[in-house]
């Protein structure tokens, strides 16, 4: 299908394709500097900390996934621009997009593992499970990385090897072989199942954690309403960020993919593509929000940040530091 026919079809659907092809890349370009700064700072701080617990192992891997996702943002944005070269689009389809999705899926899984780790330590403090060992967490993260790369990233890179018939909105799908299209469809379905399982796990774990912490305050007859409010706020922050960033995208991903693998275009497909791109950008904003979660919820990381050279020109504020690091990490 030629380009003029495509434009007319989109116009008939009430969609200004050229506008969206500029707006969405700009959103990614605006996101990149803040994401890079925050993730580089957090990665540097994490490099100064020892991996002496399963929580720290998961946290460091989460930082790695977020940093990888951040580094793909400018390529993703540039390839979406109307005048992007076919070579850049092909590189984005075959490599940067693949690593973007791999990092995003890994980030989701690690958030689930962190919530489970917090659940076992706070809700079941008297028991020690094998999955809480340092060795298990290291092996598990390596296995998950290998499974994601081996089952989704590498096969998609290998099967995205065709010369696209035309420069259209389905440029990436046109680069996939028949096997590549089927693999893409299967990979999306599998990662969607993983996401919704992790979503349920996170909600369950943090609701139980909140209940346990509030019961602990009640049993100790603590009247510190500020700490209770902080506990509720922390849990709300985690759940709110997770739901706002990820749920919209994953809600439209399956219906869009079903239409994406079909040749015939339509208004529903065109509209879902815009919604998918916007919600995908919303998911990408998580790379800015995750570092804030690390800072507010991880006492050890917050302490290391306050002790870092970033503050060497400022006088120490002992009282404030003590107050900020007194909370329990979640």
Identify the role of each PLM range:
Residues 244, 251, 275-324:
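Seventh transmembrane helix
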Residues 7-15, 83-97, 102, 133-137, ...:
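Loop architecture of class A 7-transmembrane GPCRs
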Residues 34-47, 63, 70-74, 102-126, ...:
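Cytoplasm-facing ends of alpha-helical transmembrane segments in multi-pass membrane proteins
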Residues 172-176, 180, 194, 211-251, ...:
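Intracellular effector-coupling site of seven-transmembrane GPCRs
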Residues 1-18, 215-229, 265-267, 299-330:
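Intrinsically disordered regulatory tails of 7TM GPCRs
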Residues 17-29, 54-113, 121, 128-129:
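Extracellular TM2-ECL1-early TM3 structural module of rhodopsin-like
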Residues 28, 32, 68-84, 97, ...:
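Helix-to-loop junction signature of class
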Residues 1-41, 49, 178, 187-191:
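Extracellular N-terminal segment of 7TM GPCRs
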């Amino acid at each position: 299908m030629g380009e003029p026919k495509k434009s007319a079809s989109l116009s008939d659907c009430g969609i200004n394709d050229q506008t969206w092809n500029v707006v969405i890349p700009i959103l990614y370009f605006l996101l990149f500097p803040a994401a890079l700064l925050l993730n580089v700072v957090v990665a540097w701080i994490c490099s100064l900390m020892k991996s002496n617990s399963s929580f720290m192992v998961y946290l460091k891997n989460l930082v790695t996934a977020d940093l990888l996702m951040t580094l793909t943002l400018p390529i993703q944005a540039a390839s979406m621009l109307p005048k992007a070269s076919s070579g850049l689009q092909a590189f984005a389809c075959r490599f940067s997009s693949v690593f973007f999705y791999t990092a995003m899926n890994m980030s989701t899984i690690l958030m689930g593992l962190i919530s489970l780790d917090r659940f076992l330590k706070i809700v079941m403090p008297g028991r020690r499970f094998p999955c809480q060992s340092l060795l298990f967490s290291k092996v598990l993260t390596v296995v998950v990385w290998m499974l994601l790369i081996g089952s989704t990233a590498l096969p998609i890179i290998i099967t995205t090897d065709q010369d696209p018939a035309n420069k259209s909105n389905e440029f990436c799908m046109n680069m996939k072989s028949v096997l590549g299209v089927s693999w893409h469809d299967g990979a999306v379905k599998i990662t969607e199942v993983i996401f919704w399982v992790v979503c349920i796990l996170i909600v369950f774990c943090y609701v139980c954690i909140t209940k346990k912490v509030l019961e602990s305050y009640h049993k100790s007859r603590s009247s510190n309403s500020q700490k209770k409010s902080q506990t509720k706020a922390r849990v709300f922050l985690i759940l709110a960020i997770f739901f706002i960033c990820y749920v919209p995208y994953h809600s439209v991903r399956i219906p869009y993919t079903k239409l994406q693998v079909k040749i015939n275009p339509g208004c529903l497909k065109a509209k879902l593509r815009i919604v998918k791109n916007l919600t995908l950008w919303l998911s990408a904003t998580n790379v800015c929000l995750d570092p804030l979660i690390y800072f507010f919820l991880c006492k050890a990381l917050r302490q290391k940040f306050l002790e870092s050279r970033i503050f060497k020109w400022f006088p120490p504020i002992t009282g404030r530091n003590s107050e900020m690091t007194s909370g329990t990490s979640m």
